[in-house]
């Protein structure tokens, strides 16, 4: 287990350091193994200091899940340029490292098993899903408008749901068996499928 160097910093930064230590511990040991003691060891602090920032392990886990979802996927703000290249780059970023890697898979597997039984995690999951889907829907709308195609919100929403499903499925394949695919192969497959869905080219890939 690699320990973090916990340094003097503003309250918000120290809290973020502890959240990252929580995620590292969950990725390695799972939710059950990520005790307050193990997280404190990872962070290089005392369990008492952990309790200064978080009232309980449940609160730590909830904040860690919220942070994971915020950084788990690329967001629309991470890409710039014209609508077509923006949408294409958004898709590629969400199917390549660091979004698609072993750590992401470990965290996803640990948290997703609890989403169905923990109402707070379920609410955080819904919030993260909708933020990602809304980003995707906006990128699709901008692309369709730029191409002179109808961009009805209901249709853009349907496209976003479908494309999110394509990304999720290929992301999982890449994380579980990345060695079976050539570099950028899954991103290329996703782009081809999405072009077929939209009936438009997203450019070279």
Regions found by a protein language model. Give the residues of each.
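Short, basic, alpha-helical segments at the C-terminal edge of helix-turn-helix-like DNA-binding modules
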Residues: 66-71
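Short helix-capping/turn signature of helix-turn-helix
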Residues: 54, 96, 110-117
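N-terminal intrinsically disordered/low-complexity leader segments
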Residues: 1-13, 201-205
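Hydrophobic/aromatic-rich alpha-helical bundle segments in the mid-to-C-terminal region
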Residues: 120-126, 146-205
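Helix-turn-helix
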Residues: 17, 21-59, 63
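Amphipathic alpha-helical packing segments from all-alpha helical-bundle domains
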Residues: 73, 77-78, 100-109, 119-146, ...
């Amino acid at each position: 287990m690699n320990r973090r160097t916990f340094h003097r910093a503003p309250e918000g930064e120290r809290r973020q350091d502890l959240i990252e230590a929580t995620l590292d511990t969950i990725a390695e040991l799972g939710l059950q193994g990520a005790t307050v003691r193990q997280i404190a060891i990872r962070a290089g602090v005392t369990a008492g200091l952990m309790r200064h920032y978080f009232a309980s392990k449940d609160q730590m886990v909830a904040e860690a899940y919220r942070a994971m979802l915020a950084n788990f996927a690329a967001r629309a703000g991470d890409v710039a340029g014209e609508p077509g290249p923006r949408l294409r780059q958004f898709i590629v970023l969400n199917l390549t490292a660091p979004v698609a890697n072993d750590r992401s898979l470990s965290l996803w597997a640990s948290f997703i098993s609890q989403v169905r039984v923990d109402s707070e995690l379920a609410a955080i999951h819904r919030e993260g899903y909708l933020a990602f889907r809304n980003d995707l829907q906006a990128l699709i709308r901008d692309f369709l408008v730029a191409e002179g195609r109808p961009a009805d919100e209901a249709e853009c929403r349907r496209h976003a749901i479908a494309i999110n499903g394509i990304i999720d499925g290929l992301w999982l394949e890449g994380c579980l068996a990345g060695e079976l695919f050539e570099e950028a192969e899954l991103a290329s497959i996703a782009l081809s499928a999405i072009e077929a869905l939209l009936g438009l080219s997203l450019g070279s890939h």
